Amino acid sequence: MATPGSEPQPFVPALSVATLHPLHHPHHHHHHHQHHGGTGAPGGAGGGGGGSGGFNLPLNRGLERALEEAANSGGLNLSARKLKEFPRTAAPGHDLSDTVQADLSKNRLVEVPMELCHFVSLEILNLYHNCIRVIPEAIVNLQMLTYLNLSRNQLSALPACLCGLPLKVLIASNNKLGSLPEEIGQLKQLMELDVSCNEITALPQQIGQLKSLRELNVRRNYLKVLPQELVDLSLVKFDFSCNKVLVIPICFREMKQLQVLLLENNPLQSPPAQICTKGKVHIFKYLSIQACQIKTADSLYLHTMERPHLHQHVEDGKKDSDSGVGSDNGDKRLSATEPSDEDTVSLNVPMSNIMEEEQIIKEDSCHRLSPVKGEFHQEFQPEPSLLGDSTNSGEERDQFTDRADGLHSEFMNYKARAEDCEELLRIEEDVHWQTEGIISSSKDQDMDIAMIEQLREAVDLLQDPNGLSTDITERSVLNLYPMGSAEALELQDSALNGQIQLETSPVCEVQSDLTLQSNGSQYSPNEIRENSPAVSPTTNSTAPFGLKPRSVFLRPQRNLESIDPQFTIRRKMEQMREEKELVEQLRESIEMRLKVSLHEDLGAALMDGVVLCHLVNHIRPRSVASIHVPSPAVPKLSMAKCRRNVENFLEACRKLGVPEADLCSPCDILQLDFRHIRKTVDTLLALGEKAPPPTSALRSRDLIGFCLVHILFIVLVYITYHWNALSA
């Protein structure tokens, strides 16, 4: 049912057609137009009368006709009659208990009339544009009410009793609501909720219980945060424009059924304004990218024991007859296509290596987490049993006794190195690893936030995604002992047939030896000696077809000490400290020159090129004619504008005389290569310090020359004047 002059109510016409009898609807429609026109009918005269006085007779005529029509049709229309209360005088003469629709909009009611609360068949109630401040609890009697319009009133709160109605549409816009009741979650059938133009500061969490809600309008309120519970709703339209929302939660990307999203006039920071202006698709794409970045960052900090077990990958490898060594998925792996006598068992050996490697890594990670040094021996007690149980008879056990002793000694050496690694990893005891951002707040393991951030950055550096990935076991070793790809894995040219030999950590070699011993029943002692790194290098030449054994875990004994993971970690930490000092020096240089305080994140301050352009303009004015600067509406420049600023800065540096050797590239600035940026800035500042004296000297020379020419001209004029005077 459309109301005269009211706001658009999309739900009313549908209910009007469904609830009113078709024979009564045209008559009601005609009556509606009479009121809208305001002429010709007694109802129109009544609409212009007051509640008392000389207009009682026209008012009573209009009310009588409206009430009589309501009793016959079930639709009560008392709109725009300036009523301050329900007309009680005429009501007893008519039976309105079966009223289905009631329109009391555009009146002067200060509360919902109690008479309406007795219309138990009422389905649609329109109280638009009144002065209502109170809603009686008796409204809970309207258990057939599905549409309620309370817009443009003076309500300061919605009563909890209102949430006990079977409402499908609730419109309470243009009121003074400060909040929504927590009982709003009881409106299970609510499909449309409009609380726009109010004073709501926060939405209750119970709003996520409105499973039938399809349209939510919270426009022009004081919302700062959008509750994540909105994701649980199947919203089709969501309007939160003209609020104070700063961030759209990342989880909103899961609102798959959302078709209309209105968010203008919000000080949004995430997503940025240039993304929001492009529409819902770009906003959701931005949120998805942010979610992927968060998931990727979180996966880097997972503990070794929390990561997926290796046997899951091993099972996948068995299905396609690939041990993980010979796979070529684009990374630098060893090729396993060369023919050899081992081909019949080439699949079993790497599988056993991987399974044994997983067990050793788990036990070693448990040891590194344990504060008690004595637990190290308990963790590795099962290993000698592997050597003993692998032989099926006493003779085979005797054959491998000497070799087992050698392996045990190597294993003890490995254990000692692991203990040294544990000692080195205690950053608070190593003065070389302490940087300005890594400090201990107390001796009771209360670590400073800066230390945690530095450690996370260290993990990012050490777990380089561009590194070599040889197989599943080697990735687990890199997780156990984080090393950079360039230092942890070395590809050396082997003197034997030009083959490539892969350098791995000492863990790989020990595990290879243990695995070969545990599977000794499948090999002869000679085969084991050929695959053992303890044998002389000449034994490698006895491999079939002159090729090296395909085990990726083998390497010469001479390189055991050449790759030290502790040294690699130390070097990474030193590089981090040097880079931090470099950034601070660069910050001081720019701040001293510009006399401003830069943002805490220097990389973000330099990447857009604005600061650099101001720096070169400070050294020589108007070197960069136009600079793209962020605005409050667009707080971040696009990549094209950032690159244009950077290119203008570099071009100005060339004009000032910065050598090409000292000039960084645009990619260095956009990718925050502080070493090259520092070199360019230092050269620029040095030229700036040398430039003023020649400039001032040049200006003085020009001034002196101008004065001399002026004096000479005056002298010539004087001589000419006197010469003419004498000759005359």
Swiss-Prot record:
InterPro entries in UniProt: CH_dom (IPR001715), CH_dom_sf (IPR036872), Leu-rich_rpt (IPR001611), Leu-rich_rpt_typical-subtyp (IPR003591), LRR_dom_sf (IPR032675), LRR_domain-containing (IPR050216)
Keywords: Cytoplasm, Leucine-rich repeat, Phosphoprotein, Repeat
Cell compartments where the protein resides: Cytoplasm
Entry keyword annotation includes Lyase: no
Residue numbers carrying Phosphoserine: S370, S409, S532, S536
Sequence ranges of Polar residues compositional bias: 516-525, 533-543
Predominant subcellular localization, coarse grouping: cytoplasm
Domain Calponin-homology (CH): 576-692
Compositional bias annotation for Basic residues: 24-36
Amino acid composition bias (Basic and acidic residues), ranges on this chain: 311-322
Signal peptide bounds: none
Gene Ontology CC: one annotated term: cytoplasm
Residues with Phosphothreonine modification: T568
Biased composition (Gly residues): 37-54
Positions of the UniProt region annotated as Disordered: 24-57, 311-348, 377-398, 516-547
A GO BP annotation: cellular response to chemokine
The keyword Cytoplasm appears for this protein: yes
Function comment: Acts as a negative regulator of GTPase CDC42 by sequestering CDC42-guanine exchange factor DOCK8. Probably by preventing CDC42 activation, negatively regulates CD4(+) T-cell migration.
Assembly description: Interacts (via LRR repeats) with unphosphorylated DOCK8 (via DHR-2 domain); the interaction prevents the interaction between DOCK8 and CDC42.
PANTHER family, per database record: LEUCINE RICH REPEATS AND CALPONIN HOMOLOGY DOMAIN CONTAINING 1, PTHR48051
Descriptive protein name: Leucine-rich repeat and calponin homology domain-containing protein 1
Gene: LRCH1
